[in-house]
Amino acid sequence: MAGLAGRPGSWGGLVLRVGQALFAAACIGVMGSSLGFASYTAFCYLIASMGLQMLWSFGLACLDGYAIRANKDLTSPILLSLFVVGDWVTAILSFAASSSAAGVVILFQKDVLFCRRYPQLPCGKYELATAFAFLSWALSATSALIMFWLLAAF
């Protein structure tokens, strides 16, 4: 399992973490610049969840960068247990937030036609932020599965 792509302290792990953090930051940036997002609970939850995702992923990206630079091994069972719990929690929260935001976007666009009735509503930005959140979740879920797989191999 030492050669598994995406393990902590490897270039693959660093790329996964940086991708998670960048997509979460993009989601926060797009949603935060959207007019009226704070009026909808699902969008506020998305911002909070992506904030947590960004902090967790950025912290672990820094740890991966240090481990690569110092040639350290981050695959001890204690560290992997911490990574598994953190990754699963952030992945589940990110998926819930992304799904709820997607539900509101679909409601606005297809069901009640808010986007047509209220052209000042930035539905395109809501949709783009939700897409960024799903991309961040996909990378987070990938990391969570890799960490679980590594922990199970011990």
Swiss-Prot record:
Residues 39-42, 108-130 are extracellular. GO terms for cellular component: membrane; plasma membrane. The chain crosses the membrane at residues 18-38, 43-63, 88-107, 131-151. Keywords: Cell membrane, Membrane, Transmembrane, Transmembrane helix. The keyword Transmembrane applies. It is a multi-pass membrane protein. It comes from the Eukaryota. Residues 1-17, 64-87, 152-154 are cytoplasmic. Homodimer and heterodimers. This is CASP-like protein 5B2. It comes from Zea mays.
